[in-house]
Regions:
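An N-terminal, well-structured beta->alpha segment
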Residues: 1-26
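Residue-level signal for pocket-adjacent positions within structured domains
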Residues: 3, 60, 67, 164, ...
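Generic macromolecular interface patches on structured domains
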Residues: 4-7, 11, 30, 125, ...
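Catalytic cores of large soluble enzymes that bind and process phosphate-bearing ligands
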Residues: 5-8, 12, 37, 142, ...
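Amphipathic alpha-helical interaction segments
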Residues: 15-18, 40, 173
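Glycine-rich phosphate-binding loops that contact phosphosugars or nucleotide phosphates
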Residues: 21, 29-162
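Internal, active-site/partner-interface "lid" segment
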Residues: 117, 130-135, 159-186
Length: 186
């Protein structure tokens, strides 16, 4: 965690935020995609960003090349996440998104990857020093944590720039403990 927080390129996070904000100002939308565990992360981040002021949609990593790319329009932004940055199915989705006129923000642990090269902005979620952890050092543990932290940093920048009020947040998240206005917020 410390390595990810220290190595995160805040300037590039700012560039990613600007790309998204420009798209939203022009009635574009943000989509988040990944394959496997990063696909689950994409669903979480899409929900988080949507509830905190940035219209965001989950884009299924493989279904996109089987018709779901119809949700993409020119000017949209797609965040694609992959530790290796070379996942074949994800790269097919990224190329499809680019052909549909979308800008790409790549989240990867590999700055020399296909994803990094295809992206308009690349955010590095590096786990080279720590590896993945666990007995086989293969299951995506640390890479998912690093990708989550980088995307959460981006979500904080977007939420701050959107100036989301407690009342607006509750409109997007009306139920549960988070959906109640606190006495100090009224």
């Amino acid at each position: 965690v410390d390595h990810t927080l220290k190595s995160a390129d805040r300037k590039e996070i700012g560039r990613a935020a600007e790309l998204i904000q420009e798209s939203v100002r022009n009635h574009g939308r943000l989509h988040v995609t990944g394959i496997g565990k990063p696909g689950h992360l994409a669903g979480y981040i899409a929900s988080l960003m949507a509830s905190t002021g940035t219209p965001t949609y989950f884009l299924h990593g493989t279904e996109a090349v089987h018709g779901s790319s119809g949700q993409l329009v020119p000017g949209d932004v797609v965040i694609a996440t992959s530790n290796s940055g070379n996942t074949e199915e994800l790269m097919a989705t990224v190329l499809c998104a680019k052909q549909n006129g979308c800008k790409i923000i790549g989240i990867t642990g590999n700055p020399d990857s296909q994803l990094a090269k295809a992206s308009d902005v690349t955010l590095i979620a590096d786990v080279t020093e720590a590896g993945e952890g666990g007995p086989l050092n293969r299951a995506p543990r640390n890479s998912i944590l690093a990708e989550t932290l980088v995307l959460q940093m981006l979500s904080v920048v977007l939420q701050a720039d959107a100036h989301v009020t407690p009342e607006e947040y509750v409109m997007h998240h009306p139920h549960g403990a988070l959906g109640k206005l606190r006495e100090d917020e009224v």
